[in-house]
């Protein structure tokens, strides 16, 4: 949807975009591995306004609206929503991360991600490769993991979870620490406390 606004005689054209996927984690699903689910994000240009994720296997619904916090409830949203908050872990050796890789194993992006994975594995408590970007973001927001490092992703993989992480107190950027854009293919998500050190650790010359 295109929104047109006139401000002081100047017409501004803003794009409201709905990014989503009916199933994030398709490879998991194809192997009957129960870590996947739908994801949707409503964006104004590159700013996410509303994000919703679901984990049907654990009866969990994650949602956030800009400026109103992030919450988790059951899938029917019948219980009392639990407000989400990222961890306060501030040292790598105590931190648990999730990671995601590009599908093309011959690409430079894959090779760079593999180098980052090795660095992070040495420095952190451990890393998980979950196979679902959306639920990895939900787990950062819920304080179950401390960060998510991934390459090769698309806007529809990320849009639903970005705001949920931010509203829970986390941070979302590219690998250089720059503010994210929906066109990004490489993403760095953390509890915020670890973020600057993560950026330095994962730099590739």
Report residues per predicted region.
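N-terminal subdomain of lithium-sensitive/metallo-dependent phosphomonoesterases centered on the IMPase/IPPase/PAP
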Residues: 1-23, 171, 179, 193-194, ...
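Short secondary-structure boundary segments
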Residues: 101, 151-153, 176-178
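Hydrophobic residues within well-ordered alpha-helices
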Residues: 138-141, 162-167
């Amino acid at each position: 949807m295109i929104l047109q606004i006139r401000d002081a005689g100047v017409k501004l054209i803003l794009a409201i975009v709905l990014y989503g996927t009916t199933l994030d984690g398709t490879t998991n699903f194809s192997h009957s591995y129960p870590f996947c689910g739908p994801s949707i994000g409503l964006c104004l240009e590159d700013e996410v306004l509303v994000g919703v994720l679901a984990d049907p296997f654990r009866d969990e619904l994650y949602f956030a609206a800009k400026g109103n916090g992030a919450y988790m409830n059951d899938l029917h949203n019948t219980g009392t929503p639990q407000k989400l908050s990222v961890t306060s872990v501030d040292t790598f050796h105590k931190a648990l991360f999730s990671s995601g890789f590009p599908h093309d194993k011959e690409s430079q992006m894959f090779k760079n991600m593999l180098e980052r994975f090795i660095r992070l594995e040495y420095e952190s408590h451990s890393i998980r490769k979950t196979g679902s970007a959306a639920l990895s973001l939900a787990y950062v927001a819920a304080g179950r993991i401390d960060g998510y490092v991934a390459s090769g992703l698309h806007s529809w993989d990320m849009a639903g979870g970005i705001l949920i992480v931010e509203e829970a107190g986390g941070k979302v950027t590219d690998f250089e620490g720059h503010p994210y854009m929906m066109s990004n293919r490489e993403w760095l998500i953390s509890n915020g406390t670890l973020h600057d050190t993560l950026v330095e650790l994962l730099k590739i010359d």
